[in-house]
Amino acid sequence: MIKEFALEPDVLATSFRDFSYFIEKFGVAQGRVISRFPKDWKKMVYQAAQANLRGTRELSRIEIRLKEIKDDVLLESRRPGGDGAQPWQSRALAEHASLPFSGIIALDNPTAHPDVMISVDLDGADPRFQAFGQRHINRTSNEIVDCVGLLLDRAKTVKLIDPHFNPTRARWRRMLGLVLARLKNNGQAGVTLEIHRSDDGTLPANMQSYFDSTIPNIRPAGVSVQVFLHPLAAMHNRFILTNVGGASYHTGLDDNEDGNSTPTDLVSLLSADTFSTEWATHSGHAAFRIYL
């Protein structure tokens, strides 16, 4: 659901107008992010802008906007940077052959590679660049998780928010297992998964058993799990949030693989403001259970 693009630094260095045009096309809510490839991508943009715009107000404006780019626009790539002595496009194509980007946006395409989009010709009608902030999905555990898979692969903290979350039920446990597997393999140390559900009047001992009987059996080493309870009246919406963005699920985080519920769901990627509000709402509470 979220596309990751490699964007040549020189594309942003021709003018402030071009810089703004491209940056505004990206963000988790739009279904597109820029891969921070290589790690010093911002430095490369500024150096290219210096070469083209030294002594102009445009350079200063680019410098300011470059510092303000948020994590939901420029996503940590976690990829090797390749041979720094090679041109950026050669490095990007080498990485693309190993772990494909959704596309590569560059000033030119000397090798006529089908996945390289020339910046001056790019528009929203190009199917390679098209992306959507909302999508109907089949309610399978794989599709539920894949909507935010790119974010989970970079996440340090994840919040699963569903007022009825019950890991003793297979329809939630399947999705939870997939999330934990992605967090186990995302290469970060000290990853935390939070589960937020309602305090619906279930006896505390019974609520505790929901999690004690399942979480220790599926929690991978290196991932801590915390459970939070909230007043039932305060919980309505369902989200998967990560520290780099998130999505809302209109029906729930449970799948319909057993065929007893709604077969589809509408998933919406969150704008930066909505994400910040929901992240704050589900932060700062005392945990009901912690599994380390």
Q: What residues fall within each predicted segment?
A:
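Acidic-and-aromatic substrate-binding clefts and catalytic sites of carbohydrate-active enzymes
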Residues: 166-170
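Short, charged beta->alpha transition segments
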Residues: 141-149
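Secondary-structure "cap/kink" motif recognition
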Residues: 151-155
